[in-house]
Every structure is written in C-alpha cells, then in structure tokens.
C-alpha cells in the first residue's frame, strides 16, 4: 500500500488515542477509522507495541 495509506493509519491511530485512550487502540479499529482494508495496519505494524512505536516515530518526524 502507498505511504499515504500508512500515514492515514497513523493519523487515525492518533485520533483514536486522543478520543478513547490507549485501551481502545487496536489494529482493527485503526483500519476502520482510516477506512482501510482489514489487516492494513497489521501489515505495517505486527504488534500493538510496534503500532505505538510507529505513532511515536511519526509524531517525532
């Protein structure tokens, strides 16, 4: 998937964290919020920890 889709997933993850907190963060919820096909976020970030690390790295850029 293009980098734009990955960025859309990260934006959706940040929005989800802000709106509902870290306990609400899941790959499926990020996919849904970003309007991506199921499994997209898992493809880029295999674990929840990797997803959180990706968010931190993306924000730091």
Where are these regions (language model features)?
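Base-recognition residues in the alpha-helical recognition helix of bacterial helix-turn-helix
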Residues: 38-46
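Append "Primarily bacterial transcriptional regulators
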Residues: 29-33, 41
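Residues within the helices of the helix-turn-helix
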Residues: 23, 28
């Amino acid at each position: 998937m293009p980098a734009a889709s990955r960025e859309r997933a990260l934006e959706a993850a940040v929005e989800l964290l802000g709106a509902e907190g870290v306990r609400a963060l899941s790959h499926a919820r990020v996919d849904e919020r970003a309007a991506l096909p199921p499994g997209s976020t898992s493809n880029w970030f295999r674990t929840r920890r990797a997803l959180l690390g990706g968010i931190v790295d993306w924000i730091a850029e």
